[in-house]
């Protein structure tokens, strides 16, 4: 009914006016009734009033629609601003000159500049103008590109520099003239620092790998060159030993040291020039039993008891080179035995996870302080007086080739635990 309100009211008022006029003209004025003129006059008046009222109704409806649309637009605008202000990314808009025309609240949070002080300023005033960035933007506009991305260093209000990744859209008019841009910017400082750190680590590893390769070649050459004359010296000393029986003790010391030098050279060659690995499937417990049987005599002579508990890995199969894996376990168990010169217990136990076997070797020795623990595994570093410092580096290399790892827990005065972690053979 509201859309006909003006017409209804106008017609009622017009009818009242006509009736009042007729009353004055015919009854009060005593004029004769002229029906044709009266009917035409009444009809023209009602139609005119109806048309005028129709225009008023339409205008009122149009005004109402405009107010409704204005209210809806205001609601949408407020909703859009709420959404934009809750975004973690900066949203910006610029005109053809590059002046900022819109910013969301994230701009203030990230850069420290208030939105009001930045409106109308040049967007590129807030990042470091590197040539590749400027060239990229100019090329995009010249090529009429619709969108793109670049990274740049931004400067906050307090002078802090951070990395920003910008994704933008470019807009043009009908004449292909640039009219402005709309985009988002994310703070990628942590990601950029991680990428730079990864690049630096890779470069450092590449340099170290090259150094190790050269060092390995050099070590292998030195080992061969030393071993050859050492063999000759040993042979001549054997002859001299028979000629000087009263100097037997001296010769025994010399031969003991030659044997030690030969052991160091052997381990150095093994570390520098590893042999080809033959991977086969083996029962883990069988390898451990063979190693402990081999070392039982050595342990007894050192007043050491070897306690074994392999139940957790019964039937567990691993892929690897049997001899190299035995070498790992022999080195680690011997370290445990040598860590207790006054005797004690070496405990060897196993456990397994869904994908790995864990072999633990625990001794009751003096343990190691943290500063020494950090050095363990470096070539020629040994905590033992007569150690070569090559046993653990060899173990680490072998385990790496078997996709395994070595974990060491030690505390001064409380002994050490060496854990060998090896992948189990897949059932597939």
UniProtKB/Swiss-Prot annotation:
What GO biological process term is on the record, naming one? Answer: sporulation resulting in formation of a cellular spore
What Gene Ontology cellular-component terms does the record carry? membrane raft; plasma membrane
**Where is the PAC domain positioned along the sequence?**
148-200
Segments spanning the bilayer are 8-28, 36-56
Query: What did gene disruption experiments reveal?
Result: No observable effect on sporulation. Forms a weak or no biofilm, wild-type sporulation.
In the bilayer, the protein is annotated as: Multi-pass membrane protein
Annotated InterPro entries: HATPase_C_sf, His_kinase_dom, HisK_dim/P_dom, HisK_dim/P_sf, PAC, PAS, PAS-assoc_C, PAS-like_dom_sf
Q: Does the keyword Lipid metabolism apply?
A: no
The PAS domain sits at 76-147
Q: Write down the Pfam families for this protein, in alphabetical order.
A: HATPase_c, HisKA, PAS
User: Any idea of its EC number?
Assistant: 2.7.13.3
One GO molecular-function entry = phosphorelay sensor kinase activity
Residue ranges annotated for the Histidine kinase domain, each copy included: 221-426
Report the main location listed first in the record: membrane
Where does this protein reside within or beyond the cell?
Cell membrane; Membrane raft
Reaction(s) catalyzed by this protein?
ATP + protein L-histidine = ADP + protein N-phospho-L-histidine
Phosphohistidine: residues bearing it: 224
Per the entry, induction is:
Induced at the onset of sporulation, shuts off at T3. May be under the control of Spo0A.
What's in the keyword line of the UniProt record? ATP-binding, Cell membrane, Kinase, Membrane, Nucleotide-binding, Phosphoprotein, Sporulation, Transferase, Transmembrane, Transmembrane helix, Two-component regulatory system
What exactly does this protein do?
A: Phosphorylates the sporulation-regulatory protein Spo0A a transcription factor that also controls biofilm formation. Requires FloT and FloA for localization to DRMs and for activity.
- The protein in question is named Sporulation kinase C
Species assigned in the record? Bacillus subtilis (strain 168)
State the encoding gene.
kinC
């Amino acid at each position: 009914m509201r859309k006909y309100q003006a017409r209804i009211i106008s017609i009622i008022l017009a009818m009242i006016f006509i009736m009042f006029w007729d009353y004055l003209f015919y009854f009060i004025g005593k004029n004769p009734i002229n029906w044709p003129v009266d009917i035409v006059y009444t009809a023209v008046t009602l139609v005119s009033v109806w048309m005028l009222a129709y225009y008023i109704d339409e205008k009122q409806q149009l005004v109402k629609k405009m107010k409704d649309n204005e209210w809806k637009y205001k609601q949408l605008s407020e909703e859009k601003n709420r959404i934009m202000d809750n975004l973690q990314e900066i949203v910006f808009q610029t005109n053809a000159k590059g002046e900022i025309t819109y910013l969301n609240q994230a701009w203030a949070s990230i850069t420290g500049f208030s939105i009001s002080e930045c409106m109308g300023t040049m967007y590129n005033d807030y990042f470091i103008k590197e040539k590749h960035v400027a060239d990229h933007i100019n090329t995009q506009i010249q090529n009429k590109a619709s969108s793109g991305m670049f990274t740049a260093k931004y400067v906050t209000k307090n002078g802090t520099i951070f990395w920003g990744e910008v994704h933008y859209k470019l807009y043009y008019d009908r004449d292909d003239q640039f009219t402005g841009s709309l985009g988002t910017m994310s703070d990628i400082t942590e990601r950029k620092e991680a990428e730079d750190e990864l690049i630096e680590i890779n470069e450092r590893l590449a340099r170290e790998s090259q150094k190790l390769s050269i060092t390995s070649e050099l070590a292998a050459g030195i080992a061969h060159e030393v071993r050859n004359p050492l063999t000759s010296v040993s042979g001549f000393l054997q002859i001299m030993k028979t000629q000087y029986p009263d100097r037997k003790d001296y010769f025994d010391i010399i031969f003991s040291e030659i044997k030690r030098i030969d052991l160091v050279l052997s381990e150095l060659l093994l570390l520098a020039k590893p042999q080809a690995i033959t991977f086969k499937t083996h029962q883990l417990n069988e390898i451990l039993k063979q190693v402990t049987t081999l070392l039982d005599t050595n342990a007894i002579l050192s007043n050491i008891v070897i306690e074994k508990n392999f139940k957790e890995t019964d039937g567990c199969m691993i892929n690897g080179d049997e001899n190299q894996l035995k070498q790992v376990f022999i080195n680690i168990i011997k370290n445990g035995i040598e860590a207790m010169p006054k005797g004690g217990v070496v405990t060897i136990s196993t456990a397994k996870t869904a994908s790995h076997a864990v072999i633990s070797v625990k001794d009751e020795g003096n343990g190691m302080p943290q500063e020494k623990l950090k050095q363990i595994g470096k070539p020629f570093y040994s905590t033992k007086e007569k150690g070569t410092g090559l046993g653990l580096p060899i173990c680490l290399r072998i385990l790496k080739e078997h996709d395994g790892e070595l974990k060491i827990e030690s505390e001064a005065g409380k002994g050490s635990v060496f854990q060998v972690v090896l992948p189990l053979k897949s059932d597939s």
